[in-house]
Swiss-Prot record:
Its EC number is 2.-.-.-. One of its GO terms (biological process) is lipopolysaccharide biosynthetic process. Pathway: Glycan metabolism; lacto-N-neotetraose biosynthesis; Bacterial outer membrane biogenesis; lipooligosaccharide biosynthesis. It is an enzyme of class 2 (transferase). GO terms for molecular function: glycosyltransferase activity. It comes from the Bacteria. This is Lacto-N-neotetraose biosynthesis glycosyltransferase LgtE. The gene is lgtE. Belongs to the glycosyltransferase 25 family. The keyword Transferase applies. Adds the first galactose to the lacto-N-tetraose chain in lipooligosaccharide (LOS). Keywords: Glycosyltransferase, Lipopolysaccharide biosynthesis, Transferase.
């Protein structure tokens, strides 16, 4: 398995955390230097997601987070990789993670590597809807289909066709159709046209900050992105109101799809309920 950990080159503490977390289990990995607000970021947006550059209320750090994933996908496509596992540098790994991440036979036995799919490894401890699927369990973990919003990009496996799908569509999206990258990947805001997202259950990983919150403890690593979002939230709220007025003029065609999706989720919830994806 090609395991890529998105991390700032200067984040010594987090990189030490990753080296210990992955290294102690014999899991191979490589760092991918995260983007930050810079000329390099502007160039990457211009090449891959031009609408993101003009987005009025996503912060520079949020744009950099978005583009770190997008640039990594583009790199994987250039290298001809059939799939990659992507992590962020505050990730915690669960029991037996090496059996999933040190080799990939289990993945190729269960998924068509030439199709578009995502295997979500992470939980955010939110109540979500998952629907049982025919994919066989592996090492006491199941692979139900994720049928509701489940944010976060601390750990996932994405196939070549899924990377191509997102990059092709991101390239032509206007600013008003773009949100944070986790919302594009794991909510119904963005129409993935039937591309399946499988939720590993119990989850194989979680973000350290959210696990600490779940346990009512203090975070040891914190979240730079969460801090940035909090600092800019009030200012961006006023910008968002003006931006949403503009977006409303062109959204009527999409509202029908959203209503249908909400109705579908309501029907699924009646059958399957909502539950927290545990981490172990």
């Amino acid at each position: 398995m090609q395991n890529h950990v998105i991390s700032l080159a200067s984040a010594a503490e987090r990189r030490a955390h990753i080296a210990d977390t992955f290294g102690s289990r014999g899991i191979p990995f490589q760092f991918f230097d995260a983007l930050m607000p810079s000329e390099r970021l502007e160039q990457a947006m211009a090449e891959l997601v031009p609408g993101l550059s003009a987005h009025p209320y996503l912060s520079g750090v949020e744009k950099a987070c978005f583009m770190s994933h997008a640039v990594l996908w583009e790199q994987a496509l250039d290298e001809g990789l059939p799939y990659i596992a992507v992590f962020e540098d505050d990730v915690l790994l669960g029991e037996g993670a090496e059996q999933f991440l040190a080799e990939d036979t289990w993945l190729e036995e269960r998924f068509d590597k030439d199709s578009a799919f995502i295997v979500r490894l992470e939980t955010m401890f939110a109540k979500v809807i998952v629907r049982p699927d025919k994919v066989l369990n592996y090492e006491n973990r199941s692979f139900p289909l994720l049928e509701s919003e489940h944010c976060g990009t601390a750990g996932y496996i994405i196939s070549r066709e899924a990377m191509r799908f997102f990059l092709d569509r991101f390239a032509v999206l206007p600013p008003e159709r773009i949100k944070a990258v986790d919302l594009m990947m794991f909510t119904y805001f963005f129409d993935k046209e039937g591309m399946p997202v499988y939720q590993v259950s119990p989850a194989l990983c979680t973000q350290e900050l959210h696990y600490a919150k779940f346990l009512s403890q203090n975070s040891m690593l914190g979240s730079d992105l969460e801090k940035d979002r909090e600092q800019g939230r009030r200012h961006r709220r006023s910008l968002k109101v003006m931006f949403d007025l503009k977006r409303a003029l062109g959204k009527f065609g999409r509202e029908k799809k959203k209503r249908m999706e909400r109705q579908r989720q309501a029907e699924l919830e009646k059958v399957y309920g909502r539950r927290v994806i545990l981490f172990k």
